[in-house]
């Protein structure tokens, strides 16, 4: 029997889930924290991830200890400390700064379809990772990543393109990530055995 379900996400022990939505066949690794985030179909994260204010496409592969939507502290005020906006934790007569949390929640990170985010990578708010892109382990990503590219480092920069531009564009046009579950199963042998170019020749 298949481990994953179209109806219910597979959420492992010790996770903290806050106001998040999950598509079909989603898996959340043990001890992960997911807040104000949408996970597309077939996407997963491994253990110990911290994901906030993110929009994650389909078939995203997120390794352990990844942080997406890492939150900021105020840089222009007299103090950086979160007593400025988590004030109710420090004084009985002070309220938290709701406007700060609203502004922070609006700064989404976007992760495209069929992406791979390597172990321990950090992706800042308002960054878009294009379809088919790879973020190397330990990278700090502060700028958008083009589709079907591989980036790495602190701060992340281009390592190489996965495919020639024409192939990358054709893969995006094919949008196989929108195929239904039955079709994906029928095409599984070709996903396993064909190069991207041969796959496009057969299905594009």
Explain the meaning of each model-derived region.
Residues 12, 81-123, 155-204:
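C-terminal segments of enzyme domains that contribute to small-molecule binding surfaces
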Residues 72-74, 145, 161-163:
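Conserved catalytic-core motifs of eukaryotic protein kinase domains, centered on the activation segment
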Residues 130-136, 140:
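A generic "structured core" feature
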Residues 147, 152-155:
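Acidic, glycine-centered active-site loop in nucleotide-sugar glycosyltransferases
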Residues 119, 137, 147:
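Catalytic-loop Lys-Pro-X-Asn motif of eukaryotic-like protein kinases
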Residues 4-13, 18-127:
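Flexible, glycine/small-residue-enriched loop-and-beta-strand segment within the central core
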Residues 63, 136, 152:
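Alpha/beta-hydrolase-fold catalytic nucleophile elbow
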Residues 116, 134, 150-151:
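Short-chain dehydrogenase/reductase
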């Amino acid at each position: 029997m298949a481990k994953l379900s179209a109806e219910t996400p597979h959420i492992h022990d010790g996770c903290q889930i806050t106001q998040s939505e999950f598509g079909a066949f989603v898996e959340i690794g043990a001890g992960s924290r997911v807040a104000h985030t949408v996970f597309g179909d077939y996407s997963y994260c491994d253990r110990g991830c911290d994901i906030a204010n993110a929009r994650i496409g389909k078939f995203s592969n997120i390794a352990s200890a990844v942080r997406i939507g890492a939150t900021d502290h105020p840089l222009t005020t007299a103090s950086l400390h979160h007593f400025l906006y988590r004030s109710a934790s420090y004084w009985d007569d002070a309220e938290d700064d709701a406007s700060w949390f609203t502004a922070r929640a609006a700064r989404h990170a976007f992760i495209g379809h069929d992406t791979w985010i390597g172990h321990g990578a950090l992706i800042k708010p308002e960054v878009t990772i294009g379809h088919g892109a790879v973020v190397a382990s330990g990278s700090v990503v502060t700028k958008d990543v083009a589709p079907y590219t591989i980036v790495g480092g602190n701060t992340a920069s281009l390592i190489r393109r996965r495919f020639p531009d024409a192939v990358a564009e054709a893969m995006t046009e094919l949008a196989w990530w929108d195929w239904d579950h039955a079709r994906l199963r029928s095409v599984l042998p070709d996903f396993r055995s064909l190069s991207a170019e041969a796959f496009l020749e057969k299905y594009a």
